[in-house]
Structure formats: structure tokens, C-alpha cells
Amino acid sequence: NDANFICGYEAGCLGYTLYHQLTANNVNCVILAPTTMLEQRSRRRIKTDKRDAEIIAKCLAQHNYSPVHIPTATDEETKEFLRMRDDHKLALKKIKQQILAFCLRHNYRYDGNSYWTAAHIKWLKSLNPEELYKEILDEYLLTYTTLSDKLERLDKRIEELASKDEYRESVKKLCCFIGIKTHTALSVLVEVGDFERFASAQNFASYLGLVPGEDSSGDGQTRLGITKA
């Protein structure tokens, strides 16, 4: 009767949904960060649901894992909005590539200095391919315009989200750094959540994956890329 039960699952496609469902029913639950599970290497060659469950149980019993930080409801929905905006950004990048590829295939060469300026857009709209090719280009350009307008609207909405009481001051502080604007600042805040959960700057750098790698011995020094060490 005095036993304390805890359940857990690996971070993945389920997100936080299962966690919220379990905790809402008074079930103690944690989400395990896969890279911190000390048993994970043993399952590279053999992977079954039963084996995965056994590994999770061992990690929970022996505390051989780090729990995933659970964001607040506001942080979680803001993170989803930022992810949706980034999806549109990628879609815009793709349609730009498709338009340029279309022009290249049909030998339309722009003599200006830069693509996607007002002059370049005007040039694209002035092209007059024959028959169905004209319709294809028009559809590409319509998609480009729609995505550009939508991205501008989403960025304005992000500015509004960043002005909320829980984000306003922190966003202003982060924007003091060169290269950081509202979108990046807000992304950092909702991803990190509580900065006080990091005991030191080293821990925070490790979380971000910004620790310089090194492979040195004796007088020889080799600098490597950034890591989560």
C-alpha cells in the first residue's frame, strides 16, 4: 500500500499528450530523454516493444536517465505556432527553388543582381511562355505571393505573442544580442522554459549543443565541431 508507482516513455512523436493524460488521472509519469538512457546502446541490434519496456523500467528504477522538461501550456502552444510558421518558411523556400528551376529549364535568364527583389518579381511576371507553360508559371507565382503574404502575417502575429507579459522582458533582453530578433528570442524562451533548471552555463551550453569538441593528446591538439558534451 505504501509503494510509489511511476511510469515513463521515451520522448518522440507522442509529444506531451500521453504525459498530460496520465498526470490528469493522478498517474506519476516522466518522459525520458533517449540520449541520456544508459541502457540505450544495448538495443541497437535487438529492438522489440518488450525489450524497450524493460529498458525503460530499468532506467526508471535505477535513475539512469534525464527527464524531459515539460513546458507550460502557453509555451507549448507558442512552440507549435512557431513550428507552423517555420513550415511556411520552408514552403516559401521550396517554391522559390521551383520557380528558378522552371526559368532555368526554359532558358529565361535574369540579368539583375539579386533574386526575389521587386525588380526580379516584376521580371518574372513579365515573362510570357507559350500555352500551358504560362499557366504553370502563373500558378507558381500565385503560390509564391500567397506564402509571402502569409509569412508576413505570421511574423506580425509572433510579434504580438512576444509582447505577452510572460515573454516581453525576456525577449527584449535576448534581442540585445547581435543576430537575435523576436522570432529567435521567442523560440529560445519556449524551448528552454525555465532557465534556472540549469546549474551552470556549461550545463546550458551542453543542452544547446554548443560545447566545442576536442581530441587532444600530449602536445597534439585537434579542435572538433560543437557537441552536447
Please state what every model-predicted region is:
Residues 1-229:
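A detector of single, family-specific signature residues
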